[in-house]
């Protein structure tokens, strides 16, 4: 994971500053991203792609997503895989609950890689993660970085899920420039204090 990972708050500015010096022609670059509701669909990432003129836009973000997995999260494409849901309203539907438990970065990244490998999308030149707002079980950067392999990482914590997702993208696409965007400020003081904890964890993981 010892590769350059940028933190950007103003997303398109961050990407432009890092990428322009190496890739002045964005029309030859492919853009990928993962995140939660503020990234899902054609929101800021679509604006980035359009303004800078990226060749492709591969977005696997889903609303309500977290870095952390659940104890019953399924691998993407595994036997009996239920799918992914961004639902958040109360429900007792077991299939819907399983799909919600699959709405995590690990599964999103498995989906992203599968779609590249089957030819739906090209290998990314730039990849942006923008999530963490919905995470509750933070864990610690120190614990998440102890394992030598990703199989040893506890992905049921935000820290572990983040390490798994970021490192997996870097290992699969070593030439890709990866950016990690931290949770945005809110009008809630308590929530902002919690976000500062998340930011510190993500920063430490990215510097490892």
Which functions belong to the PLM regions below?
Residues 17-21:
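Boundary at the C-terminal end of the N-terminal hydrophobic targeting segment
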Residues 25-33, 38-152, 156:
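Conserved SGNH/GDSL esterase-like catalytic core that processes O-acyl groups on lipids
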Residues 6-16:
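Bacterial N-terminal signal peptides
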Residues 49, 169-171:
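N-terminal cationic-hydrophobic initiation segments that often serve targeting/anchoring roles
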Residues 168, 179-208:
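Substrate-gating cap/lid alpha-helix
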Residues 112, 158-165, 198-202:
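A general structural detector for well-ordered alpha-helical segments in enzyme core domains, enriched
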Residues 173-178:
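A short helix->loop->beta-strand "cap" motif at the edges of active sites that frequently abuts
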Residues 1-4:
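Positively charged n-region of N-terminal signal peptides that target proteins for export
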């Amino acid at each position: 994971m010892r590769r350059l990972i940028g933190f950007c708050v103003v997303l398109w500015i961050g990407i432009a500053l890092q990428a322009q010096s190496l890739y002045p022609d964005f029309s030859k670059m492919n853009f990928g991203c993962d995140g939660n509701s503020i990234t899902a669909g054609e929101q800021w990432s679509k604006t980035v792609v359009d303004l800078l003129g990226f060749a492709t836009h591969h977005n696997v973000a889903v609303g309500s997503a977290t870095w952390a997995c659940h104890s019953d999260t399924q691998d993407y494409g595994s036997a009996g895989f239920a799918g992914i849901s961004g639902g958040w309203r109360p429900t007792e539907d077991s299939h819907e609950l399983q799909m919600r438990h699959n709405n995590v970065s690990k599964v999103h990244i498995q989906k992203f890689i599968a779609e590249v490998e089957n030819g739906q999308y090209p290998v990314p030149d730039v990849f942006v993660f923008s999530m963490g707002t919905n995470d509750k079980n933070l864990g610690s950067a120190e614990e998440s970085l102890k394992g030598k392999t990703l199989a040893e990482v506890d992905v049921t914590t935000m820290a572990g899920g983040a390490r798994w997702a970021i490192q997996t993208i870097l290992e699969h696409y070593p030439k890709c420039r990866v950016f990690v965007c931290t949770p945005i400020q809110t009008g809630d003081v308590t929530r902002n204090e919690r976000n500062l904890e998340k930011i510190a964890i993500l920063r430490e993981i990215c510097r490892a």
